[in-house]
């Protein structure tokens, strides 16, 4: 009986050891890896190598230029060499990591019969009407017509002409170096109509160091999918002035045609409002000599903040908001004039603030006070007002007056207020700006994810990153081929996808849950199970070790 009981006890001990070893093996080989896998931070793979390669991206902006030579524009020997292609490339000297080169591909050919007839007319506008085929010209392309040196199409003192469409006219010459001399003139004209250092520097103002390229006047509106424009009439003295403005007619007649032409760069929404008892917040200075009031240039920045609080918050808007304010000064401060830095009155009596909008002071004719009781009825001249606001709108979008070469006649814009090549130039600038923004966003995101290992990278975030990288590469290729429309669309997609990835809220889910907190939470859960297993393993180890050291009994 004693032997049977001892055998049962030994069997129970062996069974307990095996159970302890089994539980330990399951916990270590299955439980621990399963826990580690289920609690790890999911990070979808990203194209880090391609993102780092974006820092060394070189942009080649190709502008296709078709050069058409009429009879007697160059010597006969040179005409026999037509057609052929000449490429002019130069690097834009900007202090930016992205190297930008402008490539003008000039395709020389002879004029067709209808082109000869049009260019033989006596008026450049008649010639343009016959030559105008804007629907056949691709975005970003230019056509330059070279006419005879003695042609009466241009004034005798003018060597070139830039039209409202994608066309220009340059005088030729009978000279053995005609192609070289005319080629330089064509480059100067083409640069004025497309890409200059100023245009690209303004587009990259947020990415360049603080120097002459990044002053406030060179900071146009940032590229966006849409813009909201608000026209506000400020009447601080309704007891004296009963102001009426036909803003709907003014917008439809003057602003909407401009926005329709600009629709390729984004969507626009326009609204208006009238604010009573809205003061500027700055006390104007009285000038006894002219019996008028004035606002000095240094006080203009202080005008915006008090007024902005009355305009309504733009925080809920997804797009940039442009404010255009028409201010009718109160009777006690009339007339009111804005002064420039030299103290002289500004001709338009208006000023604009980059990326915010503009303010115009509209003085009431003092003659109406004599024959009328207060409040006097004030009819706003919308043509005068909208002319100023339209000029400010051009400046806010970075559509400045081009720097034309010497002896160049510049045509004014059509009724839309925007020339076709100005729109192309804006799209060039916006494409470069979008690529710079997208590459900066992707690089910053890659650096952030590399430094903080517990940021979750979901599959949809990774897909946005891949889409942004592909769009950047597609836009760069389209720019190199001169396909402006597709390049701009791809650059917009690059910015949108990169910002969606960067600002995705899922990136912050585990940002404030570091590894030490993970162990602090799970150790109390695992400790009650781990202590018995560990004690059993220690006991088994000690017994096994003791049995090995126990000497064998010799009979």
UniProtKB/Swiss-Prot annotation:
Keywords: Endoplasmic reticulum, Glycoprotein, GPI-anchor biosynthesis, Membrane, Transmembrane, Transmembrane helix. Glycans are attached at residues 267, 370. It is found in: Endoplasmic reticulum membrane. Disulfide bonds: none annotated. The keyword Transferase does not apply. Component of the glycosylphosphatidylinositol-anchor (GPI-anchor) transamidase (GPI-T) complex that catalyzes the formation of the linkage between a proprotein and a GPI-anchor and participates in GPI anchored protein biosynthesis. Belongs to the PIGS family. This is GPI-anchor transamidase component PIGS. The gene is Pigs.
């Amino acid at each position: 009986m004693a032997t049977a009981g001892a055998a049962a006890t030994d069997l129970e001990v062996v069974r307990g050891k095996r159970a302890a070893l089994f539980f330990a093996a399951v916990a270590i080989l299955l439980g621990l890896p399963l826990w580690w896998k289920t609690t790890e931070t999911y990070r979808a793979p990203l194209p880090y190598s391609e993102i780092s390669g974006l820092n060394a991206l070189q942009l080649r902006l190709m502008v296709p230029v078709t050069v058409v030579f009429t009879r007697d524009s160059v010597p006969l020997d040179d005409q026999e060499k037509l057609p052929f292609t000449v490429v002019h490339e130069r690097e834009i000297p900007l202090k930016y990591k992205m190297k930008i080169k402008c490539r003008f591909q000039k395709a020389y050919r002879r004029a067709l019969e209808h082109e000869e007839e049009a260019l033989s007319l006596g008026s450049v506008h008649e010639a343009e009407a016959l030559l105008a085929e804007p629907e056949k010209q691709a975005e970003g392309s230019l056509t330059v017509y070279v006419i005879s040196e003695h042609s009466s199409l241009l004034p005798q003192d003018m060597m070139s002409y830039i039209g409202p469409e994608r066309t220009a006219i340059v005088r030729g010459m009978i000279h053995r170096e005609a192609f070289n001399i005319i080629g330089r003139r064509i480059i100067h004209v083409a640069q004025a109509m497309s890409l200059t250092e100023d245009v690209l520097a303004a587009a990259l103002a947020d990415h360049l160091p603080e120097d002459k390229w990044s002053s406030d006047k060179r900071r146009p509106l940032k590229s966006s999918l849409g813009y909201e424009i608000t026209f506000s009439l400020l009447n601080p003295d309704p007891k004296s002035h009963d102001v009426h403005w036909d803003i709907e007619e003014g917008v439809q007649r003057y602003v909407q045609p401009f926005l329709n032409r600009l629709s390729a760069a984004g969507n626009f929404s326009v609204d208006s409002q009238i604010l009573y008892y809205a003061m500027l917040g700055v006390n104007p200075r009285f000038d006894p000599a002219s019996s008028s009031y004035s606002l000095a240039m240094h006080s203009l920045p202080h005008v915006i903040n008090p007024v902005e609080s009355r305009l309504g918050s733009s925080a809920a808007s997804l797009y940039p908001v442009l404010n255009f304010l028409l201010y009718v000064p109160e009777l006690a401060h009339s007339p009111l004039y804005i002064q420039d830095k030299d103290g002289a009155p500004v001709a338009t009596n208006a000023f604009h603030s980059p990326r915010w909008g503009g303010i115009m002071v509209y003085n009431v004719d003092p003659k109406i006070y004599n024959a009328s009781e207060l409040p006097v009825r004030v009819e706003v001249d919308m043509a005068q007002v909208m002319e100023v606001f339209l000029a400010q709108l051009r400046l806010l979008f970075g559509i400045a007056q081009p720097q034309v070469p010497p002896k160049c006649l510049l045509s004014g814009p059509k009724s839309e207020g925007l020339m076709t090549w100005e729109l192309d130039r804006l799209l060039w600038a916006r494409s470069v700006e979008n690529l710079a923004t997208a590459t900066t966003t992707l690089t910053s995101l890659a650096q952030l994810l590399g430094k903080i290992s517990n940021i979750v990278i979901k599959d949809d975030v990774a897909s946005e990153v891949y889409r942004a990288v592909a769009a950047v590469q597609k836009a760069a290729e389209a720019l190199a081929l001169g396909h402006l429309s597709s390049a701009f669309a791809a650059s917009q997609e690059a910015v949108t996808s990169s910002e969606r990835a960067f600002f995705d809220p899922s990136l912050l889910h585990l940002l404030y849950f570091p590894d030490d907190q993970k162990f602090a939470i799970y150790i109390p859960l695992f400790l009650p199970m781990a202590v018995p297993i560990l004690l059993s393993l220690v006991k088994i180890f000690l017994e096994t070790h003791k049995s090995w050291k126990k000497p064998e009994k010799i009979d």
